[in-house]
Amino acid sequence: MSRYVFTSESVTEGHPDKICDQVSDAVLDACLSEDPTSRVACEAVVNTGLCLITGEITSKAEVDFNKLVREVIKSIGYRSASDGGFDANSCAVLVALDQQSSDIAQGVNEAEDHSTDPLDQVGAGDQGIMFGFACDETPELMPLPISLAHRLARRLALVRHQQLIDYLLPDGKTQVSVSYENGVPCSIDTILISTQHKSEVDGITLEEEIQKRIAKDLWKFVVEPATEDLPLKPAKESTRFLVNPTGKFVIGGPQGDAGLTGRKIIVDTYGGYARHGGGAFSGKDPTKVDRSAAYAARFVAKALVAANLAKKVEVQLSYAIGVAKPISILVDSFGTGKVSDSELTQLVQDQFDLRPGAIIKAFDLQNLPSVRGGRFYRDTAAYGHFGRTDILLPWEDVSQKAKELSLLK
């Protein structure tokens, strides 16, 4: 019998890196809402009393970046110095943006596929490798450790926003360790929650007593509600529960650590359970295959698992800048496939159009911000881009494609 423990982490929307991801994607939403053909590569940096946005944007949209940045920071919960030391109203907002390089624009606008098909004429915005993954551990076909970590992080933010626990502050992290037997989850080994909090908790000032109180409240208001509908639940008797292991977490957010767009790419994807091509998502328009092709790879992998062609699937795609068709496609089913991996790879090549233009069209990636009232990508920037059940993501809707694939068996 093979036994092992696998661990994944998530972070809340108030984590410094996640503030930056949300700022970058809010800028992307604002540009695409007014001009769906906008080219955006927006990075953000936060530090004590400062938010900088930089990168390259070519767009007809008129965006008040200063106002937008402050609105994002305020919505996360940093409304005054007492909300964790970072204040949306008084922090400095610096803007240093250029236009997209004409060399890159040429490669995207005029792909070298020598075809009259409009979808062949949209080249990849850069070279790179992207991975997509799915497995049957959860209903949303995600690995259980990252799914649980996100559930806890979302719930942690919710109880703060709703003031069910009124001493919590925006910064926080979760980590879940799951025990496996023969590749199947069998128990929740450890849950770790680190959450920023006020220096005084309901009149309690002694560090050890504060830690005990926080642990009690988090189990009742976060852990139990976040896992109540799961067949595999944490148990007080057997699941190790760690809360703020250093003793206290008062200084947090940008006051405690600088943040940067694109530094939580494992949190954004599969929690380390599958490989990663290295490219971040936030702040990038859909012509950047780091983002759009990673979404497509997830769609492919999830469709294959949903069609019962395998229990676990990883899909690798690769692209060259200015070229529409993928350079390579590879499927690995880890020995769980109903057919060979080479047959699955051929099936993907035959049944999925993975050109950037086709991906953008199929998922409507350039129009979704305007269709959703000016906000789409920003909602993906915290709590993961895959397996979401709280927002509608087109690359997660594989029901029709899975049905089509099932008929091919």
UniProtKB/Swiss-Prot annotation:
Residues 100-110 are annotated as: Flexible loop. Its EC number is 2.5.1.6. CDD domains: S-AdoMet_synt. ATP binds at residues 15, 171-173, 248-249, 257, 263-264, 280, 284. K(+) binds at residue 43. NCBIfam families: metK. HAMAP family: S_AdoMet_synth1. This is S-adenosylmethionine synthase. The gene is metK.
